[in-house]
């Protein structure tokens, strides 16, 4: 695996990760995102429908929490989870937890970390964790770590220090077991940067993890509410400054478009794509614009639709402040609303996804109010393609030195 940077501007890194996979013939563009999956499958989608989406990332994200209870079957299968789930050609990254599902705290010890499957808690010692990775045979996997300390909540310095110490100990033990395993020689361990909101511990975690022979870094625990964003971004800038430039940086729990751009400016390369899934589960469609150089004629055609979405933002803010639905964002429209009952426009004018080319907002509204499964399929296809297109435009903006215009456009819609 080799990270090749073609451009670095104000902290933003543009390039490719080359020689990926067991055969070394895959490449991945950065900045980019991973394909979010549930138990190895894109939510709501079959492999056939997934192939109809443009710009699908080269690497899929699997979660250990969803696969841990099946490891005995995979151990007997012996050919890895990629072939087992019908994705033998895909690059696979195994993370500890599902970013959408919150994990109960208080179950990390000096010897184990707990993950939560459908059946309940699964305790992971280092040896059990590495045995499962041996059965899964992913291309990359997140090392075992104590991720209960984050920027979300104030935590004692003693607890934060313990989190960093445990994570480094887990990393050393995992690296030792990887060296002893012939199967895992082809897999890359991603070291985890912990430390909560304590600058000193974040920097210690970054420096110590960078001393180990890891293939990349996962910046964990940077998710939080908007009021702490500035503090989190200051931490992030300081941490990435300590990391080597020739290894990829992933971040967990950050997927909103405005936060993605802030993190890219601070040197983050790869993101999770759970945001489109969350939007789909709300019965919503992503409609935010990321075309920072729009065609004037198309702009006139889209003006009415854009004005409608701007009007919706005030309603969304009211919903957020009253607490009825704190998750809904200004990047999406709620197709369950009655006003879409006779709206025969596509979800987004000019969108090339299957849903927008073949169906209307009124049809999706009908599917949602009648609880048809097809609603989730069509919304997921659109939301994934829209989100993946956003990352394509980020890379194009970096190439042409237009990231400031893109960021202004996104933040105007987020405000």
Swiss-Prot record:
One of its GO terms (molecular function) is metal ion binding. This is Queuine tRNA-ribosyltransferase accessory subunit 2. It comes from Homo sapiens (Human). Gene3D superfamilies: Queuine tRNA-ribosyltransferase-like. Changing residue 152 to E: Does not significantly affect ability to promote formation of hypermodified nucleoside queuosine tRNA. Zn(2+) binds at residues 351, 353, 356, 382. It is a peripheral membrane protein. GO terms for biological process: tRNA-guanine transglycosylation. Keywords: Cytoplasm, Membrane, Metal-binding, Mitochondrion, Mitochondrion outer membrane, tRNA processing, Zinc. Non-catalytic subunit of the queuine tRNA-ribosyltransferase (TGT) that catalyzes the base-exchange of a guanine (G) residue with queuine (Q) at position 34 (anticodon wobble position) in tRNAs with GU(N) anticodons (tRNA-Asp, -Asn, -His and -Tyr), resulting in the hypermodified nucleoside queuosine (7-(((4,5-cis-dihydroxy-2-cyclopenten-1-yl)amino)methyl)-7-deazaguanosine). SUPFAM superfamilies: tRNA-guanine transglycosylase. Binds 1 zinc ion per subunit. InterPro entries: QTRTD1, Queuine_tRNA-ribosyltrfase, TGT-like_sf, tRNA_ribo_trans-like. Heterodimer of a catalytic subunit QTRT1 and an accessory subunit QTRT2.
